Amino acid sequence: MAQITLRGNAINTVGELPAVGSPAPAFTLTGGDLGVISSDQFRGKSVLLNIFPSVDTPVCATSVRTFDERAAASGATVLCVSKDLPFAQKRFCGAEGTENVMPASAFRDSFGEDYGVTIADGPMAGLLARAIVVIGADGNVAYTELVPEIAQEPNYEAALAALGA
């Protein structure tokens, strides 16, 4: 269990992020078309998981926009993962014109538990904590960041550097 804060108030996650150097947990997420997004699709490629509570909050929306801009320049593969319904993610990305990130919903799978990012208590219980996981082309975790305060943005530069972007 990891501890983070929401506006200074301590809350917990259900576990810990996977360790750097360990095999990344397999995942199955849902895309905006309700199709399956599987970790198998990215074998042999590096991928950045931008994990957050909801696209309908300002900091989360900023992270999607920022990674969209940065991914365009680098050609990086970025999945934006939240518990939002795929319809909400698709609406947001359509309205924002994002084209370089892939929205991926964890609304019906064990992603949050497998990656240790489901919030266990407090007003956001059940949603995902703000975190970054970079999975290398070898399938191992290359970088992680559990953002200590949900209202803060992740370290974009460190995440993209770990991705090699």
From Swiss-Prot:
It holds the Pfam family Redoxin. InterPro entries: Redoxin, Thioredoxin-like_sf, Thioredoxin_domain, TPX, Tpx_CS, Tpx_Peroxidase_subfamily. Changing residue 60 to S: Abolishes catalytic activity. Changing residue 80 to S: Increases catalytic activity. Its EC number is 1.11.1.24. Keywords: Antioxidant, Disulfide bond, Oxidoreductase, Peroxidase, Redox-active center. It catalyses: a hydroperoxide + [thioredoxin]-dithiol = an alcohol + [thioredoxin]-disulfide + H2O. GO terms for biological process: cell redox homeostasis; detoxification; response to nitrosative stress; response to oxidative stress. One of its GO terms (molecular function) is disulfide oxidoreductase activity. Disulfide bonds join 60-93. The active site is at 60 (cysteine sulfenic acid (-soh) intermediate). It comes from the Bacteria. HAMAP family: Tpx. The active site is a conserved redox-active cysteine residue, the peroxidatic cysteine (C(P)), which makes the nucleophilic attack on the peroxide substrate. The peroxide oxidizes the C(P)-SH to cysteine sulfenic acid (C(P)-SOH), which then reacts with another cysteine residue, the resolving cysteine (C(R)), to form a disulfide bridge. The disulfide is subsequently reduced by an appropriate electron donor to complete the catalytic cycle. In this atypical 2-Cys peroxiredoxin, C(R) is present in the same subunit to form an intramolecular disulfide. Homodimer. Belongs to the peroxiredoxin family. Tpx subfamily. This is Thiol peroxidase. The lineage of its organism: Bacteria, Bacillati, Actinomycetota, Actinomycetes, Mycobacteriales.
